[in-house]
Amino acid sequence: MILFQSTKNPPIKGLSYLLISLFICSCSPTLYVLDKNPQLAGRIYKTISLAKVDKRLKNNPNDLEALILNVESLTTYAFGFLIEESDRMMLENYSKANNLESQAHKYFAEAVQYGDSAFSYIDHNFYKWLISNDGSEIVDILEIGQKEEYFRLFYWTAAAYGGAISSSGGDPKWIIKLPRVGKLLNAIVSVDSSWNNGAALTALISYTMNNPLLTPNEADSISKNLFQKAIQVSGGKDMGPYLTYAESVSKTRQKKDEFISLLNQALKIDIKSSKEFQLTNTISKNRAEWLLDNIDEFFY
């Protein structure tokens, strides 16, 4: 939950684990299915969650909460299941992995459309701000009204854009939209960096490492600062920042020892110690173990 790092294309993909706030209910059956049979969990999620939101939107296309939920659901499914499976399949079957990534791209693109629609529905100035090339802030709008609702829209739309960009195969029409990811995430951080246990801070690590306006040293320094803040905000109970930094920074810079250390630090976190992070940490644990099992594939 990249943002978003892949084993194939470095452009933004590190939110896979972070974005899986999937079923939002950390009940043991849900955790068991996710842990033991993620493909089955994906089919269930697609059948139930996506269909439910789609039906709600058909009844009322201007239902803002449903629009935001659809952005979240489509992005979660694409990142949490299709991209996650694609990353793993890349080591076994390149053709199948690319097919999964292409499927994910369609969901990301659809999520972006819903996100843009939600922006326009709230206030056309939102969308004008998003697509503009200037660096103007929109903090004043975020600080009023339904802040939590707006934060969710900003966060999930940023994730949708990030996913669409990273799964586009380098399509220029998507690559040029990368600044929108930074705009949305920075808007959240500028108002409340602790929102959702520092989720935007963690996502910004991946974005920063892919920001063409930064030198490698600048990107590394900013990412390190974001990582430390994310750890502080989450009280060190969330595995997400460790995995995001490991994949976005350590792997990119080919720092194998640092990569291993970060993943091992993440795995030392007791999943059961904090119910708030139990679901996302279950996903992160599985990915960390997979990364360590296949470490020679990522370092040369």
Please give the residue ranges for each predicted region.
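N-terminal secretory signal peptides that target proteins for export/translocation
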Residues: M1-I12
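Sec-dependent signal peptide recognition
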Residues: I12-I20
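Short coil/linker segments at helix-helix boundaries
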Residues: L31-K55, N59, S73-A187, A199-K229, ...
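Short coil turns that delineate tetratricopeptide repeat
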Residues: P61, D123, S193-W195, G235-G236
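TPR alpha-solenoid repeat register
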Residues: A66, G198-A200, P241
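Acidic-aromatic/histidine active-site loop/patch
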Residues: A288
